[in-house]
UniProtKB/Swiss-Prot annotation:
The lineage of its organism: Viruses, Varidnaviria, Bamfordvirae, Nucleocytoviricota, Megaviricetes. The chain crosses the membrane at residues 36-56, 86-106, 115-135, 143-163. It is a multi-pass membrane protein. Glycans are attached at N74, N164. Its main location: membrane. It is found in: Membrane. This is Uncharacterized protein R513. Keywords: Glycoprotein, Membrane, Transmembrane, Transmembrane helix. GO terms for cellular component: membrane.
Length: 168
């Protein structure tokens, strides 16, 4: 069994990423982070909406909850499925918001902050929370096809990851 050695350069690099800088440095990172073009904002919204559609449609495809909704909304079995769907989407959406914020913090000082990816994740989480609330209080369902939602999510995420937003 070999021991894992942590080099000083690895720990100092991690400490440098996690440690906040001065107020002026962080203010500069923050102002660079929110300077997006209109087409970049479209990609962010695309990531968010297609992500929520993919999560909701995957859940619907696995459980068949849409068939039950068409039949009757007040059956106890349907009510349990909708409550489970609400809990799953709200948890995943909260994780997306937290993950997007953490990722934005970790990438804040880099030359390419992956703004489209982190803002898309955070916005997707926020829209997911709103979608979960509509399920909880109005019993709505999503009609977008499962395959289209996952393909569009993948396309927007890849677009957000690979597009250089630093203006170079």
């Amino acid at each position: 069994m070999s021991d894992v050695t942590v080099t000083p350069s690895a720990t100092s690099k991690l400490t440098g990423i996690l440690k906040p800088g001065s107020y002026e440095i962080e203010k500069g990172h923050f102002s660079r982070y929110f300077s997006l073009n209109w087409w970049q904002l479209i990609v962010v919204v695309g990531i968010a909406i297609s992500g929520i559609a993919a999560i909701a449609n995957t859940y619907d495809a696995i459980t068949g909850v849409d068939k039950d909704i068409e039949g009757c909304e007040n059956v106890s079995n349907l009510r349990k499925k909708l409550e489970a769907k609400f809990i799953i989407i709200i948890v995943l959406s909260c994780l997306a918001v937290v993950g997007g914020i953490i990722l934005a913090w970790l990438l804040r000082s880099g030359t390419n902050q992956r703004k489209l990816l982190t803002m898309g994740l955070t916005t997707g989480g926020i829209l997911g929370i709103l979608y979960a609330l509509t399920i909880r209080f109005r019993g709505t369902s999503n009609m977008v096809k499962l395959g289209i939602s996952w393909v569009s999510l993948l396309a927007f995420v890849l677009l957000g990851f690979f597009i250089n937003t630093s203006g170079e």
